[in-house]
Amino acid sequence: MSALVASSFILGGNAMASTNVVKSPLEAVSMVSEWDKAFSKSDKVDHKKVKFKNRYGVEIVGDLYTPKNLHGKAAAIAVSGPFGAVKEQSSGLYAQTLAERGFITLAFDPSYTGESGGEPRNLASPEINTDDFSAAVDFLGTKSNIDRDKIGILGVCGWGGFALNAALADPRIKAVATSTMYDMTRVMAKGYNDSVGADERYETKKKLAEQRWLDLQNGKPAYTGAINVDPKKIDASTPQFVAQYADYYRTPRGYHKRSVNSNSGESGWTKTNPISFINMPILAYASEMRTPILIVAGEKAHSRYFSEDAFKSLGNKNKELVIVPGAVHTDLYDNKNNKIPYDKFEEFFKANLK
């Protein structure tokens, strides 16, 4: 299977070339009051829904987790990811667990997805999504129980790349961690393991440009449809990492109805979503990084090379790469197999947010 075909399961590329319009039933949702997470609620932290705006005027909705019996000002961590997920999935679990360990944490839905605002729905942008992290810092820094000089961020999967990019742009971020990271601009432009060259990339750009005409003609964006495969259709020919994504997003293990990655019907990403990712690489100034860094990846993760390459390129000597023995990419989503090194994340943030 070519890297570009493999990417389609995650990026919607298999639907991208189609001229059929997929109608989207999506619209922004109001904040849900009940607990509807893919993980159990902790009795050690207080939880509430919050909202704030990013620099582009998009309203971001998040879950704020505060340790019970907190005294004085605390350090804070903003968490988001994976790419196409919602705060009720992996990022919320990380946030709640770190709050149990003494931090005030915020898990948020990126612009245009989940409960956050923005039209059209299910759109991503390397620039806007990078700013979503800085907007989270804006919000946290206004809270009376948070020391604004002790704010860090953590990005999971594709949001690992955005987290590093945000730390490069925003010196207010005092520590940055990634878990099972992707560089979404790299994989959309070059496919897995950089196997897509200029000619194939140009053909993709032509299809994306044609899709813009179709969207204009139809007065609305077309959508890719389901991002991850139906678990019932997985067989011996299915790439292992594709099956692992389905096992998380499309089963009770991690399913959430507002998640782009969990959808099984007409939505998915906008078909033109890759345009800016292909043309605007993140981490261009990686060598100038001055923020302390922790990068965590699974030993057996198909995505491991993103973490290792990012680690090599980042200039700060205060950096650490942790390879989790035996872990695949999605093992670091929900700790199903007890692979998430929470002790390491706690140690890192306590050492650098002081």
Where are these regions (language model features)?
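N-terminal cap/lid segment of alpha/beta-hydrolase-fold proteins
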Residues: L26-G72
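The serine-hydrolase catalytic nucleophile loop
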Residues: G84-Q96, P110
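Alpha/beta-hydrolase-fold enzymes
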Residues: L164-T251
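Catalytic histidine-centered segment of alpha/beta-hydrolase-like enzymes
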Residues: A327-N338
